[in-house]
Amino acid sequence: MVRFPLTERLFVVRHDRGASRRADRFRLPPALGTRIRSIGVRQTRGMASDGLTSRLPRPWDPDAFLVAFDDWARSRGLTLYPAQEEAVLELVLDRHLVLSTPTGTGKSLVAVAAHAAALAQGRRSYYTAPLKALVSEKFFDLVETFGPENVGMVTGDSSVNPDAPIVCCTAEILANIALRRGPDADVDSVVMDEFHFYADPERGWAWQVPLLVLSRARFVLMSATLGDVSAIASDLERRTGREVARVTGVERPVPLHYRYAVTPAQELVEQLLAEGLAPVYIVHFSQAAAVERAQALASVRVASREQRDAIAAAVGGFRFSAGFGQTLGRLVRSGIGVHHAGMLPRYRRLVEQLAQQGLLRVVCGTDTLGVGINVPIRTVLLTGLTKFDGTRMRQLTAREFHQVAGRAGRAGFDTQGEVVALAPEHEIENARAAAKAGDDPKARRKVVKKKAPDGFVSWGPASFERLIAAEPEPLASSLRMTAAMLIQLLSRPGADAPASAPGSAFRVVRDLVRDNHEPAARRAALARRAIALYRTLRTAGVVEQSGGGFDGTARVRLTVELQADFALNQPLSPFALAALELLDRDSPDYALDAMSIIEATLDDPRPILSQQEFRARGEAVAAMKADGIEYEERMELLEEITWPKPLAELLEHAYETFASSQPWIRDFELSPKSVVRDLYERAMGFADYVAFYQLGRSEGLVLRYLSDAYRAARQTIPDEAKTDELRDLIEWLGELVRQVDSSLLDEWAALTDGAGSASDPHRADAAVLPPAAPDVTRNRRAFLVLVRNELWRRVQLAALQRDDELVALDPDAGWPEALDAYYDAHDAIGTGASARSAARILITEHPERWQVRQIIEDPEGDHDWGIDAEVDLAASRDEGTAVVRVAGLNRL
């Protein structure tokens, strides 16, 4: 029994080890004692810094902190749930906390309390999440709560105020800090959000390592779907000597009602809307299915005239680009949203903001709903209970189901949330056929049941009921050992001590591989893996060992000095720096080759590469047919055709050479590809490129890749390696991304410039309209590349004699006649690097227009022909791209 004095009265808490700690007499001060009536989205949004930091008691006083925190919460219109009260109390008592409560029970407010308690005690706290977008969102939230001077962020792409007392980061960032600094790392308190990622086979190690290493820190482990974590909690208590409190099994503030529907999806949506169960989030397990469903629902009267008018007023000035943007524009004006990871960020935020304002009655999306998006939902409609996990189709796990289903029901608005599972399509058709036959035996005998497709993984009411009743599966450990992790451990202060010393490299590595959450067989495998990696590092000369035997005198030291952000940034950046030295700066292809090196270090954008390969194979088949190659040989040759891989042979040899002295790099795969280069060489804009490869459903992924390439090029390529052409290329890429959707680069720029006081772009009350794209003409270097690309595209088409495409671009330029005249004088049009050089373009600048001439490179070197055009600067500013009006192909 522990007695804890509070300012106004006493309450008593009984501690039952391994169980949720409930108060025998949980009599808090009046300021902490009332039950919440309405919490809503406000608990995780808009916590403005109107006094929390200034209210924190200094010196630390637990009683005063509880009252101050409650006063601040009330000033924000919030009242704590009993579960929140209990969780905050455990934090004040300086215990670890496992917080496994349903969605809508205010876990984010408990996280704020954890950071506030640490700040009040002069301690340093970390917030971790699985996605950079969630880290960024939480950063802006905490900046509003604690002020920009108290909050920092580190994501690997960028960092702002990294020495702040509160740091937001991805789980991998904290894991690497733990590996490199050990128990003495400057980490006093850790809030791990979405802790169920602990079981992720690829990334789960990053959630486990801090628990194993940071023995001084207090941990808050949060998720709505943790399952049984008693083993993890017991191990944490053993390692740290600090008790673990568990707040779990809390009743949802908005209960859920479940039903299984054997009704066509469109008809079911109409029923749900008629029953007043909007907004409805329809869960699909592919992006294509989500878009197709939304388009199918466009024929349904989802929104009333008044609702459509309100939507039109909200989105009136929003710029929807060609392609998917125009499709989305039509859908949202009908009250239907689409939400998935392949969309442009500004489109996703538009849908989220319209939904938060209650303007969208239906949102068709993917199961990303379960991780971090803030869309208020009354009803979750699951179109299936199976998904493809990258290897096979399988039924949803209990955790996956509850992650999504738990989002139904809006606290403060709904008395209950609805979760509806749709039967398989063939079963729905069979049910309709049976219903149509009625009770007529003859008609029923004629009904031919439709079979499930071959290989179909089915589900039914029993599957649904099992998922409803099932607790989330126990979290399975997924620790691993890599060369990069081993180097981090070997670089820890004191690691070069004799093997018998507690902090020596031998002891540190042994402790990690022998004392973790893995079963015995896996621990033995980790130990063997660590030994093999160590031998590789010694052979490469990265590690030196002095002494040996079993007398405990052996010492280990690294022979290389690691950069400060080793393994925190793009892991192949050091290789890229070395590979740049292999290029000839005088080569006309130097700029594109340098970009190809950067691209080879980035993650593969699989949808883009698949479409590149598909198109390349289609063109190859057409060419082989024209050459009369037989079918069998064509099929054999096709196997060798893939997406473009510039410098592949050079980079593969360089990679092997680099890995011989830096073996840790083998943990990261080199992947030559050409997306930025392909885009530039084709002289296309973003919309043209998306349309060319039919990537409308993945344009967000295309933009994310281009933005990653831009950041990597800016950060990795040193200034002394940047020629004028390479600077032009990088500036063009940045401007292209910015004009399509500036949110990615603006947010990154704000962070890297230290603008920590930037407002939260994710807030529900943020403007629906995105910030206007910057003036495309203001960056002369980038704008000039846009102009040159427009002209170069005409050169390419003219070289291929594609009159129809040129006429489509410039109907009044007289292309057919001009090309006839040109080819009477010359046999070909050059398209090599020299033909595209800056020397081949002449510009006469006027205040509102440029006169430009693209000189054609002919075989004789006469350079007497050129494309004359005018650049309209005002129109370019309006459209966010170079508006080039071609007058024609003319001879001097």
Residue ranges and their predicted role:
Residues 33-89, 93-96, 305-330:
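Helicase-associated low-complexity/disordered flanking segments
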Residues 337, 357, 449-804, 809, ...:
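Non-catalytic terminal extensions of ATP-dependent helicases
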Residues 126-128, 136, 143-152, 288-362, ...:
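Conserved C-terminal RecA-like helicase domain
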Residues 163-179, 334-345, 354-374:
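Conserved two-lobed SF2 helicase motor
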Residues 261-285, 292, 349-357:
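Conserved interdomain hinge at the start of the Helicase C-terminal
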Residues 70-72, 77-254, 261, 279-284, ...:
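Conserved P-loop/Walker A NTP-binding site and adjacent catalytic elements of P-loop NTPases
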Residues 379, 386-387, 394-435:
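Conserved segment of the helicase C-terminal RecA-like domain
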Residues 857-892:
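Compact beta-sheet-dominated globular domain cores
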